[in-house]
Swiss-Prot record:
Entry-linked PANTHER family: NEUROTRANSMITTER GATED ION CHANNEL (PTHR18945)
Pfam families listed in its UniProt record: Neur_chan_LBD, Neur_chan_memb
Lineage: Eukaryota, Metazoa, Ecdysozoa, Nematoda, Chromadorea
Taxonomic source organism: Caenorhabditis elegans
Single Gene Ontology BP annotation: chemical synaptic transmission
GO cellular component, as recorded: acetylcholine-gated channel complex; neuron projection; plasma membrane; postsynaptic membrane; synapse
Name this protein carries in UniProt: Acetylcholine receptor subunit beta-type acr-3
GO molecular function: acetylcholine-gated monoatomic cation-selective channel activity; excitatory extracellular ligand-gated monoatomic ion channel activity; extracellular ligand-gated monoatomic ion channel activity; transmembrane signaling receptor activity; transmitter-gated monoatomic ion channel activity involved in regulation of postsynaptic membrane potential
Length: 487
């Protein structure tokens, strides 16, 4: 019985010992390299050793968003860091030829590389992936990260703008004599092997630059906005409204819709100004290109409303309140109609001719009546003297009195008709002056609007320059490959 108990105890002891002993090469390797390893110590032999060199590269995966209002760029990137830890070396022949292992990042020393121009307080990476360890002591760490970085947005040429946003990485605690950065495999540009093109921005270039004596590395992300969306949604309606406001001068002055149309366009422009103000940052350094054009259109529309009021006032003028100056007749009734190839309505011309003809006829009739009555007076004075002096004098006075009354009546009617026709003629002249002013302002506003549209919208440097994103990505990939070969 005692022998059985002794055999059982020995068997249990042997099984326990076998389970505690590493039964694979990888387990033995991990026990070997972490025996006495301290992840808090910078992997250098002594304090006087040269600074540890961390090789850094950045893989650009996705441009998530550019928030112009808050001046923030959100990106999905893969920062790649490589350094050498002399404590993590082993001979692969002693561990079944194992040359590479993967360990959790909290088990080894990591360089505290963070994004300096962070905008949301999240300086570290979002996911701590495993560290790849080579038997030579080379450590490779590629943690994926989603960064929100601050970016100074230049809205001068919006929506045809280019932006240059930086991603600046560096050690948060180590001095430049303790840690230095270098390009990984000579890659001076971001890697674009896994880049997904954005639907809003085109990537133009993304060079890297070592700064502050190699203690930091800064990548300049140069992007250009795809303006098609804003061209269709914002620019084209604004341009159409700018030219539509000129149609106010094509409406007749007696139309009640002249001012209504101008005010409706003005309200639409106010709405577009509010839309632009919500998109762009409230900066006072520059005025956006689109805001300049909207402001120009807004001012032109305000002038249109004021001038339309003046035109309507001119249209309803008459000789009772306004006497047309000679210079107005010369400019607006003689010179400008010829310049603009304008003719007065035929009815007006016929009416003027009829008025002149009637005036001549009235003058002729008046002259004939005067001659007729003078002859009658002469005949009466030559009658025989037998007629009593009293009767002759009475008859002559009666005839002369009737003639004078008839002449006065004719003169009154003639004067009234003349004044009435003159009143109508002057009213028609004022109406025609308003039509000429409308035509003058139509041409003038068309020239100013066209010139302003071309001058403002075409002042952007990249209006007609199209970006082939596929070609740009291939060019940058090829450039990165050449940098690797030359390193």
């Amino acid at each position: 019985m005692q022998k059985i108990w002794l055999f059982s105890i020995i068997t249990i002891f042997l099984i326990t010992e076998l389970q505690c002993y590493p039964n694979s090469a990888e387990e033995r390797l991990l026990s070997y390299i972490f025996d006495g390893y301290n992840s808090l110590i910078r992997p250098v032999l002594n304090a006087s050793s040269p600074p540890i060199e961390v090789f850094f590269s950045l893989a650009f995966v996705l441009l998530i968003n550019v928030d112009e209002k808050n001046q923030i760029m959100q990106t999905n990137v893969w920062p790649t860091m490589k350094w050498n830890d002399y404590q993590m070396q082993w001979d692969p022949r002693e561990f079944d030829g194992i040359k590479t292992i993967r360990v959790p990042p909290d088990k080894v020393w990591l360089p505290d590389i963070v994004l300096f121009n962070n905008a949301d307080g999240n300086y570290l990476v979002s996911f701590y992936s495993n560290v790849v360890v080579e038997h030579t002591g080379d450590m490779l760490w590629v943690p994926p990260a989603v960064y929100k970085s601050s970016c100074l947005i230049d809205v001068e040429f919006f929506p045809f703008d280019e932006q240059v946003c930086s991603l600046t990485f560096g050690s948060w605690t180590f001095r430049k004599d303790e840690l230095q950065l270098s390009y990984l495999s000579g890659k001076r540009h971001v890697e674009l092997n896994d880049y997904l093109p954005s639907g809003v921005w085109d990537l133009i270039d993304a060079p890297g630059l070592l700064i502050d004596e190699r203690s930091k590395i800064s990548y300049q992300i140069k992007i250009r906005r795809k303006a098609l969306f804003y061209t269709v949604i914002l620019i084209m309606p604004t341009v159409l409204m700018a030219f539509l406001s000129m149609m106010v001068f094509y409406l007749p002055a007696e139309s009640s819709e002249k001012i209504t149309l101008a005010i409706s366009i003005l309200l639409a422009l106010v709405v577009f100004l509010l839309v632009v103000s919500k998109i762009l940052p409230p900066t006072s350094s520059t005025i956006p290109l689109m805001a300049k054009y909207l402001l120009m259109t807004f001012i032109m529309n305000m002038i249109t409303i004021m001038v339309s009021v003046i035109i309507i006032n001119v249209y309803f003028r008459g000789p009772a309140t306004h006497i047309m100056p000679n210079w107005v007749k010369t400019v607006f009734l003689k010179f400008l109609p010829v310049l603009f190839v304008m003719r007065r309505p035929e009815s007006t011309e016929k009416e003027l001719a009829k008025m002149k003809r009637e005036k001549r006829e009235r003058r002729s009739m008046k002259s004939a009546l005067k001659t007729f009555f003078k002859r009658n007076d002469a005949k009466i004075s030559e009658q025989p003297k037998q007629t009593s002096r009293k009767d002759g004098s009475s008859s002559e006075e009666k005839l002369s009195s009737d003639a004078k009354k008839a002449i006065e009546a004719i003169e009154y009617i003639t004067t009234h008709l003349t004044h009435d026709n003159a009143f109508k003629r002057q009213r028609e002249e004022w109406k025609f002056v308003s039509v000429v002013i409308d035509r003058l302002l139509l041409y003038l506003f068309f020239a100013v609007t066209t010139g302003g549209t071309v001058g403002i919208l075409l002042s952007a440097p990249n209006v007609f320059e199209q970006v082939n994103q596929t070609s740009v990505i291939e060019r940058l990939k090829q450039q990165a490959a050449e940098e690797m070969l030359n390193s």
